[in-house]
Amino acid sequence: MTTVIQPPALRDRDFRSLPHRVNNAWIDTNPLHRYCADPNLAIYDGRYFWYCTDDGVDEWGTTAFSVYVSDDLVTWERYPALDLRDVPWWNGEDGAWAPSVIQRADGRYVFYFVAGSQIGAAVGASPYGPFIPEPEPIVHKGTFDCHTIDPGTFIDTDGTRYLLWGNGRAWIAPLAEDCLSFDETRAISWIPGDFREAIWLHERNGIYYASWSENDARDEGYCVKYAMAQSLQGTWSEPKPLIMPAVDRALYATGHHNIVNIPGTDEWIVAYHRFAYDPSGRWAGGDGCHRETVFAPLVHNVDGTLEQVRPEVGSYYRPLR
């Protein structure tokens, strides 16, 4: 059995979330009082682990990643995950974007990330990090017909682990056992719907779901669509809306999501970001660099389709313990 190592949390008060009344008590809730985008929510060792782009810097210029840890999606601790200054191949271009984490068969964790339009991999003994970067990217800029960003991960029912990525075209490839390389000849691609970026996969009851973001991250109409298939090779159904902006509530640019199952249940959670409001409730603007992450339940209908997620202002409180 793998022992999860928990390091000391960072002392940082500015990521506390909005107060909300639950069972006659005021508690913190989501979204957090911190600009965070491109969420990757995972569950390890009975806790939520949320990896994201630390946002709020012009032109997406952040250079380090944090991991946020919670028992209930409401009260969070923050830990350092990876600093691009420790990445040997990073040339200083662009910033630290769109992380995604997978647990290997040996119990270790691989942290995928974007830097300089390349996808890197870093390994850690614990989901808390820190993660030690590999000497070369796992996906080099220009190798595939897409903008090399937005890694995602998927573990199929047979245990095969996959890496997903791409802007403009979606790519998927089965990973080697160490999750640090893949056979480029086995990578497949497609362009679902009006695909822009952030491809994600999940499987339930023999149905595969591909979901992705459409439009530009700076566009108020940034949104999530999905399609269904009986296998990863398709054929995929016609795209349907999954998360659309709620214009009547001024909740815009609802995209770049991921989906996670609560182990031992048929409960599913979707994490996504949208244009942020600052702690005083003022809109932070639609430059695409000031975004907030929210969490919501994801419902699978009896016919296998997904119930459209309605963006809300309130909270989603779901304890694991």
Predicted segments, located by residue:
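Carbohydrate-active catalytic/glycan-binding domains of CAZyme proteins
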Residues: M1-R321
